[in-house]
Structure formats: structure tokens, C-alpha cells
Amino acid sequence: MEMSAQRLASNRTSPQSPSNSDYTWEYEYYEIGPVSFEGLKAHKYSIVIGFWVGLAVFVIFMFFVLTLLTKTGAPHQDNAESSERRFRMNSFVSDFGKPLESDKVFSRQGNEESRSLFHCYINEVEHLDRVKVCHQTTAIDSDVHLQEASRSSGRPEEELARFMKFDIPNFVNTEQSSFGEDDLLISEAPVLLENKPVSQTSRIDLD
């Protein structure tokens, strides 16, 4: 710092005192000139310049980092597969240490299989019941037809009892039968003969 004017005033007084006083007084006066702040302007600009220079360096550094990342690209699939394998092995090891959970899984699978088998058995039983009901209905229909035929023809009940022994269904199950489609013949309606003398029937046949 520059000093425009400095004055050093020293006033040293050593008053004459008796011999038993050993004190001395010394006075020094300094006059300092006015302080100028012109030298501080350079510090303000240097702070601003340093801020912008640091920002530019940071931007350039990030630009180079991004260019390197784009050149290398994404991680390879081999690394991803190896990480997945490690994860699976870790999960397998963690699950292997818990036998109770595996027992639960096997028991659940066994329960599901037993339920599926039970449902299949129920479906088969229902199918057999339906087939039996169909056979019963066809037998009842044949009995009704025979009774109507006996009433119209006036035959004795003994012949009806003979026909009742035979339960002939009115349909053929093509799935279980081994015959082809050509072998199946459409059955014609039974011809009911009324109580007529033999001579009349022979005449009709001759005509």
C-alpha cells in the first residue's frame, strides 16, 4: 500500500527523577494516508473469469465421457447371461437350503394331480350314467311300442312277455361298433299283421 504522507513523531521523555525511579516513557505516532481500493478490481474480474473457465472445462470433460460411452455401447449379452445364471444359482442355493418349501411344492403338485384325476373319474361316471339312461329310455320306448302293437293286434300276453325279454335299442353307437358306414342299414318299421285268415294273406301276396 502506498502512503502519501507519513510522519514519525517520537517524543522520548526521560524526566529527571530521583535515583530510585527506574521508569522510562516512549511515545511513537504514525500518520497513515488515505487507502485506495483500485487494486481490488482485478480480484473481482479474476473470480468471474475463473468461474467461466471451470464451467467450460467441466462441459468439455462431460462431452468426452459421453463420446466414450456411445462408442463402447451397451453391455454385452454374455455379461447379462452370466449375471442371470449367477442369480439363478443363488436362488437355487437359497431354495435348496429350505427343504420344507420344496415339500410344500411337491404336495401342491400331488394335490393338483389328484384333483384332476378325480374330475376325470367324475366325468367318466357321468358319461356312463348318461349312456345307461339312454339305454333305459330306448328300452321303455320299445316296450311302449310293443304294448301298442299288442293292443292293436290283439295277441296274447305270452307273446308280449317273449318280446319284453329282448331289449333292442333303436340306435346304433357308431363310436363303439366296428362296422363301417356302408354296413349300417336303416331299419324299417315293423310290419304289423292284423288278425286275418291265411287265405286272404296268400291272395294279397299272389296279387
From Swiss-Prot:
Location in the cell: Cell membrane; Endoplasmic reticulum membrane
GO CC annotation terms, alphabetical: endoplasmic reticulum membrane; plasma membrane
Phenotype caused by lack of the gene: Obesity. Mice are normal at birth, with normal weight gain and post-weaning food intake during early life, although young males trend toward greater weight and food intake with advancing age. Mice of both genders gradually become extremely obese on a diet of regular chow ad libitum.
Entries under InterPro entries matching the protein: MRAP
GO molecular function per UniProt: corticotropin hormone receptor binding; identical protein binding; signaling receptor regulator activity; type 1 melanocortin receptor binding; type 3 melanocortin receptor binding; type 4 melanocortin receptor binding; type 5 melanocortin receptor binding
Transmembrane segments: 47-67
Record's bilayer topology term: Single-pass membrane protein
Region listing for Disordered, in residue ranges: 1-21
Tissue specificity remark: Predominantly expressed in the brain, mainly in the pons and cerebellum but also in regions involved in energy homeostasis, such as the hypothalamus and brainstem.
Location, primary (coarse class): membrane
UniProt keyword list: Cell membrane, Endoplasmic reticulum, Glycoprotein, Membrane, Phosphoprotein, Transmembrane, Transmembrane helix
Residue numbers of Phosphoserine PTMs: 91
Residues bearing carbohydrate: 11
Coiled coil residues, start to end: none
Keyword set includes Metal-binding: no
UniProt feature, compositional bias: Polar residues: 7-21
GO biological process: energy homeostasis; energy reserve metabolic process; feeding behavior; negative regulation of adenylate cyclase-activating G protein-coupled receptor signaling pathway; negative regulation of protein localization to plasma membrane; positive regulation of adenylate cyclase-activating G protein-coupled receptor signaling pathway; protein localization to plasma membrane
Family: Belongs to the MRAP family.
Functional description taken from the UniProt entry: Modulator of melanocortin receptor 4 (MC4R), a receptor involved in energy homeostasis. Plays a central role in the control of energy homeostasis and body weight regulation by increasing ligand-sensitivity of MC4R and MC4R-mediated generation of cAMP. May also act as a negative regulator of MC2R: competes with MRAP for binding to MC2R and impairs the binding of corticotropin (ACTH) to MC2R. May also regulate activity of other melanocortin receptors (MC1R, MC3R and MC5R); however, additional evidence is required in vivo.
Subunit structure: Homodimer and heterodimer. Forms antiparallel homodimers and heterodimers with MRAP. Interacts with MC1R, MC2R, MC3R and MC5R. Interacts with MC4R.
Protein name: Melanocortin-2 receptor accessory protein 2
Gene that encodes the chain: Mrap2
